[in-house]
Amino acid sequence: MSESLKTGMDLPCVSDGVGDRVRSDSTSSTASQGSKGRLLLRQRLSQLLTCVEDLSSDDEANEEVSRTLAEAFQLCGNISPRETLRLHMVTWNVATAEPPDDVTSLLYLDTQPTTDLYVIGLQEVNAAPLKFLSDLLLEDSWSHHFMNTLAPREYIKVSSVRMQGLLLLVFSKKIHVPFIRDIQTTYTRTGLFGYWGNKGGVSVRFSLYGHMMCFVNCHLAAHMDYALQRVDEFEYILETQDFDLVNTPSVRDHKVVFWFGDLNFRIADHGMHFLRSSINSGRFNLLWERDQLLTMRKKEPFLQEFEEGPLKFKPTYKFDLNSDTYDTSGKKRKPAWTDRILWRIKPKNTPAAEDKEEGWASTSTHHSDDGQDEYPIKVLQDTYTCDPSYGVSDHKPVIGIFDLEMRKQSDCPLVCVCPEGHWSADQEAVVSYTVLEDFLSSTWDWIGLYKVRLEEGVVGGEVVFVLPVSTNLLE
């Protein structure tokens, strides 16, 4: 169809008290309000049972109560259950290097549960003029490598966007592809006053089972003294990136936003000896107070809407190549958590004012107005770490794994296409299709037959045959 996938702290983190799992949600009431509501409902049901005991079998009220209970049971049956999707995110400044031979540990391919959605953000992909032109004609080596790795496991590349060295890739389990819709990409340059794309942000937005999500991969200004500029650049990216959909015209209109990349924030004030001593002893908490991003989040209201898991892994910059040794060159760059993954749940228009304790927050509930939260979504961070085994770059890759707990707003494909009988090259083939009743059809709609290049994990390439959509049965 014309709308195919081709169109395409004091708050450093929040813990739910179970290990390092970090939770935020879009439920429309606090936990205490929910408990009060359930208690009131139980009381009303108890009163109703007492009334039922007093009713006679021929009482008119008996029939009315029975009808009311039947409607209540039907309403409960229509509420779709919560389901959990596994999101695996990677951010990695690859410093123009070619991909390593094996990315199994980076993608947690040998662990359970399996991932539903991969979102991979790279920075400093080789963008030398000849290399960049060749990547435009073919596929860049990183995209090709990830596709070759994930395709045999039935992942499909849903979308990608590149701006010079910035690359963002989205892969999905095949089963979810019909429910990933309204895919759009965009980018913003911030390098050289917005005229050069070596710095900036690239974004992919889409609807996942009806929930609007946006992923923003950024590479911000470098060096210790440019923390304010980094904040300004990110705010500029948020303000300038727009999309075609009326209900989500900007990044912050989406129900869930993930902000990640080489954000380039440093650890201020501390000397090299104190930094390395704290890192070697695993006392990372001694460095949090001087982490520039955590400091800026205390000052900037728009950054306070974002959450991040605790930084309980070694700073990921800067390393000697193919080693676990921090920079020994003449520059001797100080170690820093430059590579980060944060997320934001769309808040209500009037967020409640809450006093927040210093340090890592213990609870956090963000509220969303979307559909009055008939279909809430929760973001539960399971893992936030780096993988030190990769040495092709002076950065170590950072991994964030999330459980997306959601009630699906849509669980029916827009279009169902069913081949009838056995298809063979020397026989007529018949395919039938059905569309949802509220599907907005057009005379420009069409059905295309594609070669599925599973070896590259993407549906596309040469269109073998195209048919206009005019009837419900095509021959």
Regions found by a protein language model. Name each.
Residues 1-160, 166-168, 234, 238, ...:
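N-terminal, active-site-proximal structural segment of metallo-dependent hydrolase catalytic domains
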Residues 62, 78-80, 85, 92-96, ...:
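Amphipathic alpha-helical protein-protein interaction segments
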Residues 79-89, 166-168, 176-180, 199-215:
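Beta-strand-turn-beta hairpins that frame and shape the catalytic cleft
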Residues 86-95, 171, 183-185, 211-225:
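Active-site-proximal beta-strand elements of phosphoester/diester hydrolases
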Residues 98-106, 191-205, 235-249, 260:
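A Trp-anchored, charged/polar loop motif used as the substrate-binding/catalytic surface
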